[in-house]
């Protein structure tokens, strides 16, 4: 299943999460959660640098996914790029900081917590996580991929050095959307070349 580090403001359990104070904070009004954009409208973003938010995330992942039989988690959209205000406040384990300072670790924390939820639910279950973004260290918790690419020879040409470069940077398990994520269905030879 594809999970994201945020929730639309219109979702039924948004109010419950808001009361648990699990979201990053507005830079101009630190008592309020920050709002960014999601596919379906405005939403709030988890603050994985906050202990209470980490526990709430694991509880969510366990109850919604792991307890119903999944051990594979697709951690997506964890770049926090739709928060246009880079001074949004994060807890950073009580030290405080901004999303601009701590954005690189958010996807790593998200993947670690998702894996922890799987292992805490069943110590014999081995989690498998995929993540679209990450910094050094994420390879301990997730495979990454090059992001949403387009069905084209140009994307294939671009993704090859991206994957190789990630490997040289210590991320041994990097991939791409085979055949492309967006655009027309790939022609036969393009799909074969992606597979090679």
Where are the regions a protein language model picked out?
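Catalytic-domain carbohydrate-binding cleft regions of carbohydrate-active enzymes
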Residues: 1-196
């Amino acid at each position: 299943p594809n999970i994201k580090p945020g929730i639309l403001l219109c979702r039924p359990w948004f109010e419950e999460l808001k009361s648990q104070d699990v979201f990053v904070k507005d830079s101009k009004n630190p008592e309020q959660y920050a709002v960014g954009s999601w596919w379906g409208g405005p939403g709030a973003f988890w603050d994985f640098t906050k202990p209470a938010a980490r526990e709430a995330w694991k509880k969510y992942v366990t109850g919604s996914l792991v307890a119903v039989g999944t051990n594979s988690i697709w951690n997506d959209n964890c770049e926090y790029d739709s928060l246009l205000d880079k001074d949004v406040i994060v807890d950073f384990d009580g030290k405080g900081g901004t999303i601009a300072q701590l954005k690189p670790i958010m996807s790593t924390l998200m993947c670690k917590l998702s894996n922890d939820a799987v292992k805490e639910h069943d110590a014999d279950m081995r989690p498998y996580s995929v993540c679209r973004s990450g910094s050094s260290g994420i390879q301990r918790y997730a495979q990454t991929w090059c992001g949403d690419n387009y069905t084209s020879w140009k994307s294939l040409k671009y993704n090859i050095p991206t994957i190789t470069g990630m490997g040289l940077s210590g991320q041994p398990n990097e991939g791409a959307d085979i055949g492309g994520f967006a655009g027309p269905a790939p022609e036969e030879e393009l799909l074969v070349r992606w597979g090679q």
